[in-house]
């Protein structure tokens, strides 16, 4: 049986079985380009937050940038010079481009801007600031004192032996700056300091506030306790048996005295045939790059339409057109109060909407046609948009969509989606049959006799040629000196594309033809109907 209640509402109803204020949290380490695989976590959290608010809940939504995590290795996109920074917190090492405050901000800034464009507005926390301002200090004290109890939980749940010199806190070496090569040798609860020795042979004392960080399996449950997190989505890797959620839910209860958050486990987004996206392997399409190609609400729709536990296949090539078409049909149904639109699909649309951002009425596919007919000239784009029956009042939104299409054509569009209008009748017109030539001449005369013609009307006019007694059929018959010719519309569409593009196929004919000035079509079709290689040399 088809779903009638959206998954975000189902989760919200479950969450609200517990009274009180709710905090939806999401967190990502900005160690590389934050990609649309990561976006699933944030959009999922936003959908549940919206659902909670819609149900009248007292709820907040936060995003934690785990920028105090160490650089794990020299990733493929980094120069070898970064080897000296491996093991240091990414908030404390240089920006790759030199224009940001640090490495983490280089990747975080475009991601936060992408969230804004997606209509997602969580309160943003940076982990380095939380540690340095002392938000974690009490949790660090508790973890250090209860080190043995935490180690026991880790061993019982994960099945792995914890080393005798393991500590829940990783001090940051004053000498080399790393947090992955230090060992705790002692701590002072009153002074709130930790003693350590580092593999670089330096030893020292650091403050608990900012002098290091909790290990991941302790940091996560400590965060739930410190911030009061009640709901959090996370990838299936954290949800594996004996994984960080399994250990975290015991640590947060038994060590920090707080209930674990409601878990929302999500599957990966697979990039075409390349597999699951990963910043560290370079199999990515960053959110900011994808927003240069796809309208924000379509990216939201990609996530919202699918339950979190199901994987998503994403291909920015030809399949992207189908995705956009699907969303645009849903939008039309919703706006026209289509009775065939079910409750579930209606809710999908509501949660896909990116509030406060451009939402052009022009279909993406139609802009693909318009942009290429206009040869990328935005003034011409505006003229065609107006001629196609759309408002040109919001030029900013039209420009944004045109830019999306421009990037898509350049980077991902399959060959069949691209075309170039020939400046003169192409030589391929020599291959036109007698029937095709008669059609083009008759079609030109019929167009000339009409006022403005819409894309749908162009489409229907061409198809009318097959109907005996139609005006176009009669005109073709006159050109051929024949009675009611047998016409295959496919041959007529082929004639249109040959005369304009020099190829036998092209974009949807109605949209395509309505993009041109009527006078241009009349002249071109008449010329093509009389084309001869000898005459047109």
Swiss-Prot record:
Q: Which locations, inside or outside the cell, does it occupy?
A: Cytoplasm
InterPro entries in the record: aa-tRNA-synth_I_codon-bd_sub2 (IPR020751), aa-tRNA-synth_I_CS (IPR001412), aa_tRNA-synth_I_cd-bd_sf (IPR008925), Lys-tRNA-ligase (IPR002904), Lys-tRNA-ligase_SC_fold (IPR042078), Rossmann-like_a/b/a_fold (IPR014729)
**One cellular component (GO) term of this entry:** cytoplasm
- Which GO BP terms apply? lysyl-tRNA aminoacylation
Q: Which GO terms describe its molecular function?
A: ATP binding; lysine-tRNA ligase activity; tRNA binding
Motif 'KMSKS' region per UniProt: ranges:
276-280
Q: Which positions are tagged coiled coil?
A: none
Q: Which reaction does it catalyse?
A: tRNA(Lys) + L-lysine + ATP = L-lysyl-tRNA(Lys) + AMP + diphosphate
NCBIfam families linked to this entry? lysS_arch
Know the name of this protein? Lysine--tRNA ligase
């Amino acid at each position: 049986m088809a779903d009638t209640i959206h998954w975000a509402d189902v989760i919200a109803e479950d969450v609200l079985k517990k009274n009180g204020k709710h905090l939806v949290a999401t967190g990502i380490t900005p160690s590389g380009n934050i990609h649309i695989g990561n976006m699933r976590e944030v959009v999922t959290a936003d959908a549940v937050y919206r659902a909670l608010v819609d149900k009248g809940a007292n709820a907040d939504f936060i995003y934690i940038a785990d920028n105090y995590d160490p650089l794990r290795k020299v990733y493929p996109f980094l120069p070898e010079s970064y080897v000296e920074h491996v093991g240091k917190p990414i908030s404390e090492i240089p920006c790759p481009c030199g224009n940001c405050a640090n490495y983490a901000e280089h990747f975080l800034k475009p991601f936060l801007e992408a969230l804004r464009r997606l209509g997602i507005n969580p309160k943003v926390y940076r982990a380095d600031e939380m540690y340095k301002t002392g938000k974690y200090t009490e949790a660090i004290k508790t973890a250090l004192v209860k080190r043995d109890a935490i180690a026991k939980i880790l061993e019982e749940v994960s099945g792995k032996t914890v080393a005798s010199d393991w500590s829940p806190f990783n001090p940051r070496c004053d000498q080399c700056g790393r947090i992955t090569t230090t060992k705790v040798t002692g701590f002072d609860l009153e002074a709130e300091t930790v003693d350590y020795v580092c593999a670089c042979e330096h030893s020292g004392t650091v403050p608990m506030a900012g002098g290091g960080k909790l290990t991941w399996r302790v940091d996560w449950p400590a965060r739930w306790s410190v911030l009061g997190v009640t709901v959090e989505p996370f990838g299936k890797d954290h949800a594996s048996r004996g994984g960080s959620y399994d250990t975290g839910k015991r640590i947060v209860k038994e060590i920090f005295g707080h209930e674990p958050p409601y878990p929302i486990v999500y599957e990966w987004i697979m990039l075409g045939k390349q597999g699951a996206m990963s910043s560290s392997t370079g199999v990515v399409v960053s959110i900011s790059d994808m927003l240069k190609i796809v309208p924000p609400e379509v990216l939201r729709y990609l996530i919202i339409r699918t339950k979190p536990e199901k994987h998503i296949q994403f291909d920015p090539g030809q399949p992207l057109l189908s995705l956009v078409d699907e969303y645009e049909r849903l939008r039309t149904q919703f706006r026209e109060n289509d009775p065939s639109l079910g409750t579930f699909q209606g809710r999908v649309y509501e949660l896909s909407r990116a509030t406060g951002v451009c939402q052009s009425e022009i279909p993406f596919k139609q802009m693909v046609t318009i942009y290429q007919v206009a040869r990328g000239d935005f003034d011409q784009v505006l003229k065609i948009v107006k001629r196609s029956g759309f408002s040109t009042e919001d030029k900013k939104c039209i420009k944004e969509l045109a830019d999306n299409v421009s990037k898509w054509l350049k980077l991902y569009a399959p060959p069949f989606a691209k075309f170039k209008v020939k400046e003169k009748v192409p030589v391929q017109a020599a291959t036109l049959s007698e029937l095709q030539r008669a059609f083009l001449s008759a079609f030109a005369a019929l167009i000339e006799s009409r006022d403005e013609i819409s894309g749908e009307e162009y489409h229907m006019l061409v198809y009318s040629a097959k109907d005996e007694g139609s005006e176009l059929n009669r005109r073709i018959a006159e050109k051929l000196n024949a009675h009611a010719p047998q016409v295959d519309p496919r041959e007529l569409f082929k004639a249109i594309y040959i005369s304009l593009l020099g190829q036998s196929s092209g974009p949807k004919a109605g949209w395509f033809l309505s993009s041109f000035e009527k006078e241009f079509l009349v002249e071109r079709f008449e010329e093509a109907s009389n084309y001869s290689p000898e005459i047109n040399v």
